[in-house]
Amino acid sequence: MKLAFFDTKPYDKPGFDEHIAGTDIEIKYFETRLGEDTVQLAKGFDGVCVFVNDTVNAKVVNELYDLGVRVVALRCAGFNNVDTKACFGKLHVFRVPAYSPYAVAEHAMALLLTVNRHTNKAYIRTRDFNFSLSGLTGFDLHGKTVGVVGTGKIGRIFAKICKGFGMRVLAYDKFPNPDSRLDYVELPELLRQ
């Protein structure tokens, strides 16, 4: 199978090359995004692999089909950039079913810690041999109240991480999960606290 890989980033190649080693899959990497102006690059390929900023609208779908492409593989969970109705009966569309909810929740906590402890500023200062603490002190998260809006997989994992920091967790969801062991409140109350 020959695959045209669009919107390629430097971090894409090593992982994909390793994954296809020993298979009959051949990838040609393009840094350009797939769209109406670049669809001809897919000529001679069985499939295209696209990312969030590629455009797979009806015109692109029809041209891909005319070029002999039969597969659109997305490197993301979202598929709002793909006209799935236009693909029906022509192209098979595959996407990432979900991201790791742990990775997303942990990243959210990393951002919270960065904002609170100013680690981004501290990094820049120490790199420049400035070890002043002025403007870098944050506050203890322990004992603070955090509000979690949305208690799906990611929200529940984030709440668990916050509890591990000793934080009080309030939650809001249109459809509260009774098994989550979270303290649900209405959104205005969550925002107030």
Predicted segments, located by residue:
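N-terminal glycine-/charge-rich "phosphate-binding" loop or analogous flexible N-terminal tail
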Residues: M1-F45
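Short beta->alpha connector loops
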Residues: T8-Y11, E31-G35, V52-V56, R75-F79, ...
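Rossmann-fold NAD(P)-dependent oxidoreductase module
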Residues: H19, H107, L111, I157, ...
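Short gly/ser/thr-rich secondary-structure transition/capping motifs
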Residues: K28-R33, V52, R125-S134, P178-Y184
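Short amphipathic alpha-helix with an adjacent loop that forms part of the alpha/beta core around
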Residues: E36-G44, N62, E186-R192
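Phosphate/diphosphate ligand-binding glycine-rich loop within oxidoreductases
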Residues: F45-Y123
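Rossmann-like dinucleotide/phosphate-binding beta-alpha-beta segment
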Residues: S134-Q193
